[in-house]
């Protein structure tokens, strides 16, 4: 039966993806046998697998297999050539435990095949079984016996082509990840292929490889367990998902698999980001609203935009400028007519006086201009010899400024060069963050006649059509420092540039850096935020933005958003209005548009301005919550924006939900994603759900429920789940002003009468985020036995250095979902046993919602955030 299963897998591969079965590199699968197995003193497993004889297909004869349980929840299986070193992601780029030595002096194979060996340390839920003849391996879950990864016999390992297939349980596996692609579904569809090769392709194109490569997926299986799988490789690849199998086809490197036990989605991302690096902490101001456009005319144009946002009373935190500001599109220069230092510097200074920020774009290509010794960046780059090479000379590309050289960020001096250029430029224009674009790397030159690296034996499905991998990028034969070819390093460039940029900003400012990168790889979240690239002003792109946002949360990149109102093409008033209602709840919220398209600043249409004020007004109230979620992301990898199954993994109905999302565990966003409707269909998992705009109980369900909600043109549905305590502040036009307002606590009761939450506070831009810096953590708890008796809200100050030295107060507590037969005649309020005024003039009142639960507003409070308190509310009838 095993042989039949393998034949069926191969048949499915050819039926559903014939292109993947036509490569000249593919041929008879090599049967391998384990020749030797050893267990190291550290408990790792080492083995050698070899083919039965000389292969006519170029298979590597001897493979070294290394397997180790690196933590109780993380298993590594690495397969490489036993006799020759091969490219793999360098340790200094993604620090990780080094594998053990390979077996070079294994004993010859015996006539009787070795039995399968098992790696199953006590305390771990992961079990590895290595099968001897033919060689294959299986990863299973000890607690359930469920098989997580089961490779088919016939692993292929050639110099430029590696292939391995794993069976999956048909009907039970739900896969997410394997990016970056614009997909119409967050859950991966059966019989689909996923190409990973960083490319300058517009995000408006569906089902093609885009700017980043993340060979990681999460598998959520009924009834609610989850695990993760990473193939750590920077080489180009196709991954084919057929529902009952997943096949990797990689054009180089090694097979370096990591398996993460979970057993729930939050645990998987915790384990994954523990390996690849935790997400970078973002400055508080970056959670404000951002405005950008490719095509701003001059500094006066920027000034008008800022002034009109203020006049319209729409929050604006950060003003951005695209490549328009440059002199001939050259990095670290200013246009000599429209964006002179004499005009731009005072504009930036005025932004700063108003507690607003300024961000500029950089592209990696440095203009080749040897006759112009005044372009200092080029001159210094040549002096330090840090550019990418070809045949011993600098590789010439072509982008916006014309011919360019690209910094080689694998060169040990390149990061220092980049940091110095940032510092020199900031002396003229003190930008607050940097946006790095075109770093796939994008290259406008048409491919030259191809060689073996341009067109390897297996052609991945680049651009959805199998284009050569040199299309619109640096040629794979270009050489990085140390002799590494672009063929191997290609997918790492954006990560390396983000690392150099972030470190440069940190060194120059001493503050927490904000970097936004278009190209990403495994671990990029350690250095950069991300946006979904060049989307289009269409309703489809509005919908797809949720899928990409949720996928990047899995990849350890929680600070993500899409260009609000769409980048390419002309938007419409209705689309822009609905987009800001969604975009106000992206972790990264920015309006951006392309040159020669209609402008789309939010104030241009009265209806969009109204939607913006309402949605962004709520976002700014939620800033303490967003920032607390950023702290959670930095400490545990938990996404800010999450799919519903993160909180409800046992509810199978949530597995396919991708038109709604959660912020943290408590806030549910259900936007309108089509033109015309004034209602939206939403799914509510089991529990109580309260409207965040008016605090009323909207849905109470024990099993999960689909509900049609009213969604008038100026409103997005946002709900708070029962059991949550949510700290809010008041809305303002900047985050700085919002931070100076008093806190409110929303206490949304669960069915059992409990609720909890927490608040993280610091100065908003200290580099030592939540560790050695000045910070505070406060936990809030609520419990009322059987929904009867006095109400008690308690705070617990876990860490207090920040709040203790500042006057931060909670002026109001709102209790939502209190069951009461009638409105109480009187509310008596005690704080730490002392009675306080509870009059209507102080803002205390009770809103009776009948059987759906009442809302008690307790106002006039001065609860000090940095001091523990107990708030007790008694109701007299």
From Swiss-Prot:
GO terms for molecular function: alpha-1,4-glucosidase activity; carbohydrate binding. Its EC number is 3.2.1.20. Disulfide bonds: none annotated. Residues 89-115 are annotated as: Disordered. The keyword Glycoprotein applies. It is an enzyme of class 3 (hydrolase). The active site is at residues 437, 440, 534. Keywords: Glycoprotein, Glycosidase, Hydrolase, Signal. Glycans are attached at residues 191, 298, 338, 391, 471, 570. SUPFAM superfamilies: (Trans)glycosidases, Galactose mutarotase-like, Glycosyl hydrolase domain. Pfam families: Gal_mutarotas_2, Glyco_hydro_31_2nd, Glyco_hydro_31_3rd. This is Alpha-glucosidase. It comes from Hordeum vulgare.
């Amino acid at each position: 039966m095993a042989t039949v299963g393998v034949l069926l897998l191969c048949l499915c591969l050819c039926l559903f993806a014939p292109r993947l079965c036509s490569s000249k590199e593919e041929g008879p699968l090599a049967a391998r046998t384990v020749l030797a197995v050893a267990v190291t003193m550290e408990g790792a497993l080492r083995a050698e697998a070899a083919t039965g004889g000389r292969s006519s297909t170029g298979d590597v004869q001897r493979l070294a297999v290394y397997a180790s349980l690196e933590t109780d929840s993380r298993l590594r299986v690495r397969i490489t050539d036993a006799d020759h070193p091969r490219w793999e992601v360098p340790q200094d780029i993604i620090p990780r435990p080094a594998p053990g030595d390979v077996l070079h002096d294994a004993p010859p194979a015996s006539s009787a095949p070795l039995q399968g060996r098992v790696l199953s340390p006590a305390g771990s839920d992961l079990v590895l079984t290595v099968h001897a003849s033919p060689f294959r391996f299986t990863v299973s879950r000890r607690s359930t016996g469920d098989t997580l990864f089961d490779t088919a016999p016939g692993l292929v390992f050639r110099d430029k082509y590696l292939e391995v297939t794993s069976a999956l349980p048909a009907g039970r596996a739900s896969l997410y990840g394997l990016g970056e692609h614009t997909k119409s579904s967050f859950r991966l569809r059966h019989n689909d292929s996923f190409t990973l090769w960083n490319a300058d392709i517009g995000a408006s194109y569906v089902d093609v490889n885009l700017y980043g490569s993340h060979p990681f997926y999460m598998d959520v299986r009924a009834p609610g367990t989850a695990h993760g799988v990473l193939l750590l490789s920077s080489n180009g690849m196709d991954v084919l998902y057929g529902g009952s199998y997943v096949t990797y086809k990689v054009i180089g490197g090694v097979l370096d698999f990591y398996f993460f036990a979970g057993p729930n989605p939050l645990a998987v991302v915790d384990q994954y980001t523990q390996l690849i690096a935790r997400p970078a902490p973002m400055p508080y101001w970056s959670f404000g609203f951002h405005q950008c456009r490719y095509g701003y005319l001059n500094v006066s144009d920027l000034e008008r935009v800022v002034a009109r946002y203020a006049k319209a009373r729409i929050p604006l935190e950060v003003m951005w400028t695209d490549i328009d500001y440059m002199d001939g599109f050259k990095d670290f220069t200013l246009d000599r007519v429209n964006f002179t230092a004499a005009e731009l510097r005072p504009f930036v200074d005025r932004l700063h006086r108003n507690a607003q920020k300024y961000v500029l774009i950089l592209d990696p290509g440095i203009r080749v201009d040897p006759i112009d010794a005044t372009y200092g960046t080029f001159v210094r780059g040549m002096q330090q010899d840090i550019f990418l090479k070809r045949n011993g000379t600098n590789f010439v590309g072509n982008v916006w400024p014309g011919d360019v050289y690209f910094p080689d960020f694998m060169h040990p001096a390149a990061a220092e060069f980049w940091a110095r250029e940032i510092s020199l430029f900031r002396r003229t224009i003190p930008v607050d963050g940097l946006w790095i674009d075109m770093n796939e790397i994008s290259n406008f030159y048409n491919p030259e006649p191809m060689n073996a690296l341009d067109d390897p034996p297996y052609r991945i499905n680049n651009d959805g059509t199998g284009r050569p991998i040199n299309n619109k990028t640096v040629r794979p034969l270009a050489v990085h420092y140390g002799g590494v070819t672009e063929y191997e390093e290609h997918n790492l460039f954006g990560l390396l540039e983000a690392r150099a940029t972030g470190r440069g900003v940190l060194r120059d400012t001493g503050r927490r850096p904000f970097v936004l990168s278009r190209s990403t790889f495994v671990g990029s979240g350690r250095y950069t935020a991300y946006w979904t690239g060049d989307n289009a002003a269409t309703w489809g792109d509005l919908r797809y933005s949720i899928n990409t946002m949720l996928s990047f949360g899995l990849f350890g990149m929680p600070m993500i958003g899409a260009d609000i109102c769409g980048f390419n093409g002309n938007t419409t008033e209705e689309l822009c209005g609905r987009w800001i209602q969604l975009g106000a709840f992206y972790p990264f919220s920015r309006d951006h548009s392309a040159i020669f398209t209609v402008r789309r600043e939010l104030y241009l249409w009265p209806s969009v301005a109204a939607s913006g004020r309402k949605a962004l007004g709520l976002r700014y109230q939620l800033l303490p919550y967003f920032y607390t979620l950023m702290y959670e992301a930095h400490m545990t990898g938990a996404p800010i924006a999450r799919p519903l199954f993160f909180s409800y993994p046992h509810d199978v109905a949530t597995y396919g939900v991708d038109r709604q999302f959660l912020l943290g565990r408590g806030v549910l966003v259900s936007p309108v994603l089509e033109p015309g409707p004034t209602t939206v269909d939403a799914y509510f998992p089991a529990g109580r759900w309260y409207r965040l705009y008016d605090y009323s109980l909207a849905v109470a369900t024990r099993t999960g429920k689909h509900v049609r909600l009213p969604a008038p043109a100026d409103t997005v549905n946002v709900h708070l789940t029962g059991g949550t305590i949510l700290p809010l502040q008041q809305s303002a036009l900047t985050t700085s002003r919002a931070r100076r307002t008093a806190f409110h606590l929303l206490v949304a009761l669960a069915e059992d009468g409990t609720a909890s939450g927490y608040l993280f506070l610091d100065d908003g831009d200290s580099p030592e985020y939540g560790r050695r810096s000045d910070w505070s953590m406060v936990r809030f708890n609520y419990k009322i036995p059987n929904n009867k008796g006095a109400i008690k809200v308690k705070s617990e100050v876990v860490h207090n250095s920040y709040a203790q030295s500042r006057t931060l107060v909670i002026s109001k507590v709102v209790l939502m979902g209190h069951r009461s037969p009638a409105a109480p005649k009187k509310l008596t309020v005690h704080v730490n046993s002392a009675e306080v005024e509870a009059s209507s003039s102080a803002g205390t009142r009770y809103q009776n919602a009948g059987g759906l639960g009442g809302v008690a507003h307790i106002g006039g409070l001065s609860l000090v955030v940095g001091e523990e308190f107990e708030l007790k509310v008694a109701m007299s009838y």
